[in-house]
Amino acid sequence: MFRTLKASQKRSLVNLMFGTTALFATATVIFPSLLPCPAMKNPYLDTQSDPGYEELPENSRVIVIDQQSPKSSLVASKQNNPPSKS
């Protein structure tokens, strides 16, 4: 069904495949710098703002609670409670 290739034909085929692969790899690296993607003009276009987001005062503290770790929830709850006056 398939024909056996001669040594020179095998060498030519391997060289052609290598050259084609090298050409496409080089083109893949070079073309984005020559023809930049028009969708990437502003890198912040795909960010979404939180609908409940409000501008915070300059000296305010933000506490981030990690839901996966029980230790961080404990630390955050201690930070939220003001110290008791004795």
From Swiss-Prot:
Disruption phenotype: Elongated cellular morphology at division. The keyword Nucleotide-binding does not apply. One of its GO terms (cellular component) is mitochondrial matrix. One of its GO terms (biological process) is mitochondrial cytochrome c oxidase assembly. Pfam families: COA2. It is found in: Mitochondrion inner membrane. It is a peripheral membrane protein. Keywords: Membrane, Mitochondrion, Mitochondrion inner membrane. Required for efficient assembly of cytochrome c oxidase in the mitochondrial inner membrane. Belongs to the COA2 family. This is Cytochrome c oxidase assembly factor 2.
